[in-house]
Regions:
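Conserved helicase NTPase motor core
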Residues: 1-47, 63-67, 331
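Conserved helicase core region in the C-terminal RecA-like lobe
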Residues: 3, 28, 138, 295-349, ...
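Short glycine-/polar-rich loops that comprise or flank the Walker A/P-loop
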Residues: 21-24, 30-32, 53-58, 96-100, ...
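Proline-centered turn/helix-capping motifs that create local helix->coil transitions or kinks
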Residues: 23, 78-88, 245, 290-295
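Conserved nucleotide-binding/hydrolysis micro-motifs of P-loop NTPases
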Residues: 31-35, 40-44, 64-69, 109, ...
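Helicase P-loop NTPase motor core
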Residues: 54-57, 62-155, 182-183
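ATPase/helicase motor core of nucleic-acid motors
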Residues: 95-98, 125-248, 267-271
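Accessory C-terminal helicase-associated subdomains
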Residues: 222-328, 349, 375
Length: 400
């Protein structure tokens, strides 16, 4: 049984039954590469194998033929901080190579531009983009890098389809508010956001194809508190009309109270509101430098078209630098590897709180590091979405 570190309890039970009565089992695996807990994989099965089968003969394959000495040693320094693993010492017949490069960048765009320029130099020196990979913890984090590659027409291939943030209902809600502020008071648009946040407006009150706030006031004329809410909405739309997209999104989130609605929505759906806020951060970031709603809408259309073109190209031929999550790159190797956003909250992921979860995050980072044959870059940012970001604790372990 190969890749035994990824086995789950049900699979193990089946294998044990098949191995009876002679208990004849040959397994191969690397406990440091067990990264599929979300699929049910349990590295403890491999770690406890000798207890289940006393007298097991263990053979340690301790030579790494892929990485340079510098890359291998850096990865081993880091993974040794995991407590639940087989202690092992690996060596490589390869050259010492260049030290692992830890890069501090100010913002995600600067990080992406740094990678772009280095890739361009790599190609100018005779390297092939197919022998380079840019890795992220999650698919969504690849967005900035993909934008830069499309902007500078550098070919890339992506294993996963990058979601278009502008197709998300959160973005449609923001647009609904901004279009209403510009005078588009269609019933469909108004219904979408009239209770986001909750204003207690009923659908029965919205019966016209084009909504009139004056008609709404007449409908609720006997409820002064409802008229006050409609007056407030009208005032908010007037303010919104004068704002550029970045300020408008910020006002919808904090002034109108859209984030308040998202908190209630997340609690009702039993999901984390932080993930919705992160999407809003990404959407708001894209409005920087936009002077008008029309300009932003043109940008959104252009972005969507570029994503479709990229998907069409990829379906015909796969070439260029690989953009991938750490999970999807397991088993592959590249001459040059860049791991981006090596920050707390990304690597390790923000949901990893328990020691067991942190150990899996460390294994995942180890898998990413050991994809590199000759050159490895570990990049982190100091700021994102106008907030400070902390570099990953794993970088300290790599260095020391």
């Amino acid at each position: 049984v190969d890749e035994f570190q990824d086995i789950n309890p049900v699979q193990y039970d089946v294998i044990r039954l098949l191995a009876e009565p002679r208990k004849n089992l040959f397994i191969v695996g690397d406990d440091d590469q067990s990264i599929y807990h979300f699929r049910g994989a349990r590295p403890q099965i491999m770690l406890n194998f000798e207890k289940d089968y006393p007298g097991t003969q263990k053979v340690l394959l301790n030579v790494n033929y892929r990485c340079t000495e510098e890359i291998l040693n850096s990865a081993m320094r880091m993974i040794k901080h995991n407590k639940n693993r087989f202690p092992k010492k690996l060596s490589t017949p390869n050259e010492k190579g260049c030290p692992v490069q830890i890069c501090q960048l100010e913002q995600p765009r600067q990080q992406s531009l740094f990678v772009l320029k280095d890739l361009q130099k790599f190609v100018e020196a005779g390297g092939s983009l197919e022998d380079a990979a840019v890795l992220f913890r999650t698919n969504l984090e690849a967005e900035n890098m993909v934008n830069v590659l499309m902007e500078f027409h550098l070919p890339f291939t992506m294993k996963e389809r990058l979601p278009n943030r502008y197709e998300h209902w959160n973005c449609r809600n923001l647009l609904d508010y901004m279009e209403m502020a510009q005078g588009d008071m269609s019933r469909k648009r108004f219904l979408a956001v009239m209770n986001r946040p909750n204003r207690y407006i009923s659908r029965e009150a919205v019966y016209e194809k084009r909504v009139s706030l004056e008609s709404l006031r007449m409908y609720y004329e006997e409820k002064e508190w409802m008229c006050d809410r409609i007056d407030l909405l009208e005032e908010q739309l007037k303010l919104l009309r004068q704002m550029k997209p970045y300020a408008a999104v910020n006002f919808i989130r904090h002034g109108i109270g859209y984030e308040e609605y998202l908190r209630d929505y997340a609690a009702y759906r039993k999901i984390k509101s932080e993930e919705l806020f992160e999407l809003l951060d990404r959407i708001q970031e894209s409005t920087k430098g936009m002077d008008s709603l029309e300009q932003w809408k043109e940008h959104m259309e252009d972005y969507g078209n570029k994503l479709k073109e990229q998907a069409a190209r990829q379906s015909q031929k796969s070439e260029g630098v690989t953009i991938s999550t750490l999970h999807s790159v397991k088993g592959l190797e590249y001459e040059r590897v860049y791991i981006l956003n090596v920050n707390e909250g990304s690597i390790p992921y923000k949901k990893a709180v328990l020691e067991e979860q942190l150990e899996e995050e460390r294994r995942l980072f180890y898998v990413g590091m050991t994809r590199a044959r000759k050159k490895l870059f570990l990049c982190y940012v100091t700021h994102q979405f106008e907030k400070e970001r902390e570099r990953s604790r794993f970088l300290e372990e790599v260095e020391n």
